[in-house]
A protein has these predicted regions:
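ATP-binding N-lobe of GHMP and related small-molecule kinases
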Residues: 2-157, 161, 165-182, 187, ...
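Short acidic (Asp/Glu) patches
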Residues: 69-71, 223-224, 228
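Single conserved hydrophobic/aromatic residue that forms the stacking wall/gate
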Residues: 225-237
């Protein structure tokens, strides 16, 4: 979608039904301002990009069974309406550039997807996600992205899993026609965190961020039951 078209849709209520599935009614107007600001900041960073895609991925909270995912236990948890949003423009430069609000921009070359020993930041997460997609046969040629998040780091609602879900959802939607399901998206995020970032996390955080809603998860056989309607990570436009 062209940037101006996106802005017009936000202003005229074209995305209100989508926003209503993500945010509380009283928050929709402030969220519109947040999305408009994100697009403006993206435009300032990448002025030559005019076709954009916009994504949202939620944080999560656990209700019961925290940490038992490591022992193949059962968890009740839910996605929250605090999320990370990403504005992306896809291209064929074989590089991923990401600028997150409050952090320096980083770049990941798609010609070098090996683990970088000692590099444990967001760049390694993105490198691991891209590597896993390539292992699965998905051809990626690059994108530029600006992200802003109210899933605060260190707040206990999985800012890293939300970021992983955002990146994997963007890649899957554009380069793979949304063919990878929510469970596989979660596994890709866990793979990047385990083998590239170096954190031996379980799968609960990524699963809840990816499948959305209020959910019962059985990690013995990796099954799930939605207790409420899911609010999946989504492509806004």
């Amino acid at each position: 979608m062209k940037i101006q078209d996106f802005q017009d849709n936000v202003t005229c209520g074209g995305f209100d039904n989508i926003f209503a599935n993500i945010y509380k009614p009283q928050d929709i107007e402030s969220q519109k301002s947040r999305y408009m600001s994100a697009v403006e900041k993206f435009t300032a960073l990448y002025p030559n990009r005019n076709d954009i895609h916009v994504y949202s991925a939620p944080g999560r909270t656990e209700i019961g069974g925290n940490h038992t995912d490591h022992q193949h236990g059962c968890v009740i948890a839910g996605a929250v309406d605090l999320d990370v949003i990403g504005v992306a423009a896809f291209h064929h430069e074989n590089i991923i550039r990401i600028k997150s609000e409050g952090y320096d921009e980083f770049a990941v070359s798609l010609d070098d997807l090996d683990v970088h020993i000692g590099e444990k930041g967001s760049s390694e997460i993105v490198r691991g996600i891209a590597a896993r997609f390539k292992d699965l046969g998905v051809e990626i040629s690059g994108f530029d992205m600006y992200t802003t998040s109210n899933v605060l780091a260190g707040s206990g609602i999985s800012s890293s899993a939300a970021f992983e879900t955002l990146i994997a959802t963007a890649i899957d939607s554009y380069y793979n026609n949304n063919q990878i399901g929510a469970v596989e998206i979660a596994k890709i995020g866990q793979y990047a965190e385990n083998f590239y970032f170096g954190k031996k996390s379980g799968l609960m955080d990524q699963m809840v961020c990816s499948v959305g809603g209020f959910v019962f998860l059985d990690f013995q056989n990796l099954s799930l039951i939605h207790i409420s309607e899911p609010t999946r990570p989504r492509l806004i436009s």
